[in-house]
A protein has these predicted regions:
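Long, Pro/Ser/Thr-rich low-complexity/intrinsically disordered regulatory tracts in eukaryotic proteins
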Residues: 1-114, 129, 141-143, 147-175
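Phosphate-binding loop of NTP-binding sites
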Residues: 138
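Conserved phosphate/anionic-ligand binding catalytic regions in large, soluble enzymes, centered on
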Residues: 116-135
Length: 175
């Protein structure tokens, strides 16, 4: 429903602009951007390719320092991404929580005591949280060991993805 997407987009943009962690940031509507700007957002990992290629009613709120981005109407209504250097997942989680808490002051999430947070994509239901790291592994990529490492990590419940996320190939030994 195009009107529903537009309403969600406008509400989220307005609500996110009041979140302290995003202060000074920019809300970008995909419909208003030229293709090269969309490509830059994807290259900087601030928006997914799916969001950039989608049409009406989608956008992204980017913090001033580009350490946080919130995609609106991508796979789910909101996708909060935070970035930190040096495998500092705790700092990234604190930033994501600050955005989430700020947004939740003015919005109500769909929540079930049985299933957790209800999302448009059923595989994201529950906490909706996924932690990811990007690593440069040139020695493993050049050796015959990378396939073994991927299989071993898979047995531990860890997914290895390409540089652009799910379903993408790695390039330059980035995983």
């Amino acid at each position: 429903d195009p009107n529903g997407l537009s309403e969600v987009l406008n509400f989220c943009g307005q609500t996110l602009s009041g979140v302290r962690k995003l202060s000074g940031g920019t809300f970008l509507k995909m419909d208003d951007l030229p293709q090269h700007d969309k490509d830059m957002l994807v290259e900087e990992r601030l928006a997914s390719r799916e969001l950039a290629e989608s049409s009406y009613g989608r956008g992204v709120f980017v913090s001033a320092d580009k350490s946080c981005a919130v995609m609106v109407n991508e796979e789910d209504h909101l996708r909060i991404q935070t970035f930190s250097k040096g495998l500092n997942l705790a700092a990234a989680l604190r930033s994501a929580n600050a955005i989430d808490d700020g947004f939740e002051k003015n919005a109500k999430y769909a929540f079930s005591p049985t299933f957790g947070y209800l999302t448009a994509c059923p595989t994201n239901t529950g906490t909706g949280l996924r932690a990811s790291v990007m690593m440069h592994l040139p020695a493993l990529a050049l050796s015959d060991l990378m396939d073994k490492v991927v299989r071993g990590l898979s047995q531990l419940g860890i997914c290895v993805r390409g540089a652009s996320g799910e379903g993408s190939d790695s390039f330059g030994s980035f995983f």
